[in-house]
Amino acid sequence: MPARISVAIVCLFVCVSTACAIDDYKLGPDSQPQEGVPRGTMIQGKWVSEKIYPGTERDYWIYTPAQYDKSKPACLMVFQDGGGYAKADGQFRIPVVFDNLIHRKEMPVTIGVFLNPGTVPPTEAGQKGRSNRSFEYDSLGDQYARFLLEEVLPGLAEKHSLKWTDDPEGRGTCGISSGGICAFTVAWERPDQFRKVISHIGSFTNIRGGHVYPALIRQKEKKPLRVFLQDGTNDLDNLHGHWPLANQQMA
């Protein structure tokens, strides 16, 4: 899948731009470790929800840039399906991209929080847990935003002695497919907390009602959001909807 992550981040934190392209994306220098660029640190853990999605378990990763000063709040970006984004040798390579862009001062010092969707543990030995991904990501409303704001982010900040900004202009969300619509929903519901969104192939379709967003955007008062939408003409077209068309209508 295309991974124009460095372009997206620069667009969100630095400038506003509109682009349309059909090509095979190739990783550029921003996605490769560069000589002389200090590397941030990654830690991994497991979060068990006790409030918003009680009983669900999920892995998380936290990226802290080398330039982070604990006496100053950093910017914050939250990634859904975080395991894929957190891999330094994966498709997105967020730790590497952040290292390079922060070093060149093309984006502010930013902590990355990478969350996998929750899993409901099995009730019997030998069974697999049940994924809670679609319920968490595709549902409209503020439940997932509350999960972040009331449970995960305060808990992780306390546990790992981290400080990030309360300014919504310095806080973003990111995701792919159902994670993309989830990232948008968080900012849509709580623009007082998050105002930057990156959506890769966002599922603005009728999986759990997300097809209503283009109409809602037209009908509701304009919100102070900066959104990067990425999709391709060969993406899904099925009973839930047409992904490329849905993303065009969002714009």
Name every feature range the model reports, one short phrase each.
Residues 1-5:
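Positively charged n-region of N-terminal signal peptides that target proteins for export
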Residues 6-17:
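Bacterial N-terminal signal peptides
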Residues 21-251:
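Non-catalytic cap/lid and distal C-terminal segments of serine-dependent acyl enzymes
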